[in-house]
From Swiss-Prot:
SUPFAM superfamilies: CNF1/YfiH-like putative cysteine hydrolases. Residues 197-215 have a biased composition (Basic and acidic residues). Belongs to the CheD family. It is an enzyme of class 3 (hydrolase). Gene3D superfamilies: 3.30.1330.200. One of its GO terms (molecular function) is protein-glutamine glutaminase activity. It holds the Pfam family CheD. Its EC number is 3.5.1.44. GO terms for biological process: chemotaxis. InterPro entries: CheD-like_sf, Chemorcpt_Glu_NH3ase_CheD, Cytotoxic_necrot_fac-like_cat. It comes from Bordetella pertussis (strain Tohama I / ATCC BAA-589 / NCTC 13251). HAMAP family: CheD (MF_01440). This is Probable chemoreceptor glutamine deamidase CheD.
Length: 215
């Protein structure tokens, strides 16, 4: 499945705290390095980020997805919003960059229930369970994970050597809360819209009242 070019993160900056060039990964984006020494950074609420790299050649990448899976019959499911698509894109782009599938290692983060609405829909929990199941199916070992809880997280990932630094953000961090609330509301609206749009399937548990054929 080809990657969406508009989903590749483009927001570059220099992080003074880490003295490193960096790329900011927003929701529904991904980034794969070509061996350059760069830090990938994102902020997570109920969303999940998978950090995957090939330790032999130092190529790695990160994605940031909001929901586990969409309706496979809907074109909307083929977007970086959904984990199933975001994971496939990330792995395919790593292989294109020279990574070897058998050497890939993963670290996964996020899936927090940072807002009450997210707790009711279990979006964070579902995202976390999805990414673990996906990686298990693909045979990619998970070397570290920090999933669940009620905190937002800032992730700083160094793909060249696989290091990840996680900072759990205070529950009342106003700037973070405002940003995450906006993203979480969008995710919740998507879930609700998909639930309303789900086709109804009629069940035929009782014998039909039609006249027998040939009557």
């Amino acid at each position: 499945m080809p990657a969406r070019l508009d989903a590749r993160a483009t927001r570059r900056y220099f992080d003074n705290a880490f003295n490193s060039p960096a790329v900011k990964i927003l929701p529904n984006e991904y980034y794969v390095t070509n061996g350059e020494d760069v830090m990938l950074s994102t902020v997570l609420g109920s969303c999940v980020a998978a950090c995957i790299h090939d330790p032999v050649i130092g190529v790695g990448g990160m994605n940031h997805f909001m929901l586990p899976e969409g309706d496979i019959h809907s074109p909307a499911s083929a977007t970086m919003r959904y984990g199933a698509f975001a994971m496939e894109v990330l792995i395919n782009e790593l292989l294109k960059a020279g990574a070897v599938r058998e050497r890939l290692e993963a670290k996964v983060f996020g899936g927090g229930a940072v807002l009450s609405a997210m707790q009711l829909m279990n979006i964070g929990e579902r995202n976390g369970q999805f990414v673990l199941n996906y990686l298990k199916t693909e045979g990619i070992p998970v070397r570290a994970q920090d999933l669940g809880d009620v905190h937002a997280r800032r992730i700083n990932y160094f793909p060249r050597d696989g290091r990840v630094m996680v900072r759990k953000m205070a529950p009342h961090h106003q700037k973070a809360e405002a940003l995450i609330a906006q993203r979480e509301a969008a995710a919740a609206q998507t879930v609700q819209a998909e639930t309303r749009a789900a086709p109804r399937v009629e069940r035929f548990d009782t014998p039909s009242r039609r006249d027998p054929v040939g009557a």
